[in-house]
């Protein structure tokens, strides 16, 4: 299991919240105090809640559930794309389209269009079009790739969602809640924790804090997926052994006859 230490959290600045005048009173249980007009998050709580979130993500991945990483603010974009890709999952890091989950069937049509355009450029079909038409389709492809590239291979709704800054990603969280998709999130002092199933109290603005926590969640996904693969592999080997034993038994009976 990938643990997280107080030292790591401090070095990444996870304890720095928002200005005291910009807070959500529901975050009071997660706040240690205030310093120079800034709320300080209780890192002991962060360690405890992170452990719970990590275990949930790991177990969810072990059951075969997929994860959608969501973080569209500038500070989160790179970490979200890199870590989701590293653990073989999906991400949205540019713009959340309303209905991305609740109207997924329509979004899938746009994904199919993107895949079709990709294929046209890869197999040379695009050369049959005029330069002007090809340029227009290339721009369409770029636009679709920017918004849908991270979910291009997501064929069904995700099993859970990991969110950086649920206040900023309010629509995404609302859609997940409406569909019963569990949400794990980095929750800063200005957020509403009631919307989140697994709260990780922490700084959702600093790049280092975002990168640390996102990488750890990706580790949880990978650990769960690896455990699942071991079980599936041993199950397949067991089935092969059983088939071989049955074949031997049939052969023995045939020779006895």
From Swiss-Prot:
The keyword Ribosomal protein applies. The lineage of its organism: Bacteria, Pseudomonadati, Thermodesulfobacteriota, Desulfuromonadia, Geobacterales. NCBIfam families: rpsB_bact. GO terms for cellular component: cytosolic small ribosomal subunit. Disulfide bonds: none annotated. GO terms for molecular function: structural constituent of ribosome. It comes from Trichlorobacter lovleyi (strain ATCC BAA-1151 / DSM 17278 / SZ) (Geobacter lovleyi). InterPro entries: Ribosomal_uS2 (IPR001865), Ribosomal_uS2_bac/mit/plastid (IPR005706), Ribosomal_uS2_CS (IPR018130), Ribosomal_uS2_flav_dom_sf (IPR023591). It comes from the Bacteria. Belongs to the universal ribosomal protein uS2 family. GO terms for biological process: translation. Keywords: Ribonucleoprotein, Ribosomal protein. Pfam families: Ribosomal_S2. This is Small ribosomal subunit protein uS2.
């Amino acid at each position: 299991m990938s643990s997280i230490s107080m030292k790591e959290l401090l070095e990444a600045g996870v304890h720095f919240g928002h200005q005291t005048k910009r807070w959500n009173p529901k975050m009071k249980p997660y706040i240690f105090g205030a310093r120079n007009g800034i709320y300080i998050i209780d890192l002991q709580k962060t360690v405890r809640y992170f452990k719970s979130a990590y275990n949930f993500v790991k177990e969810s991945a072990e059951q075969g559930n997929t994860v959608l990483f969501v973080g569209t603010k500038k500070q989160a974009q790179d970490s979200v794309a890199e870590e989701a890709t590293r653990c073989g999952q999906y991400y949205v890091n540019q713009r959340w389209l309303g209905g991305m989950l609740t109207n997924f069937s329509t979004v899938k049509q746009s994904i199919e269009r993107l895949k079709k355009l990709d294929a046209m450029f890869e197999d040379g079909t695009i050369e049959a079009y005029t330069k002007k038409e090809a340029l227009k389709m290339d721009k369409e492809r770029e636009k679709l790739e920017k918004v849908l590239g991270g979910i291009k291979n997501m064929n069904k709704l995700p099993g859970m969602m990991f969110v950086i800054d649920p206040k900023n990603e309010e629509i995404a969280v609302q859609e997940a809640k409406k569909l019963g998709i569990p949400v794990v999130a980095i929750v800063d002092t200005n957020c509403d924790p009631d919307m989140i199933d697994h709260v990780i109290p922490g700084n959702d603005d600093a790049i280092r804090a975002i990168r640390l926590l996102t990488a750890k969640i990706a580790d949880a996904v990978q650990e769960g997926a690896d455990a699942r693969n071991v079980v599936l592999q041993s199950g397949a080997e067991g089935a092969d052994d059983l088939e071989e034993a049955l074949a031997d038994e049939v052969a023995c009976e045939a020779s006895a006859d």
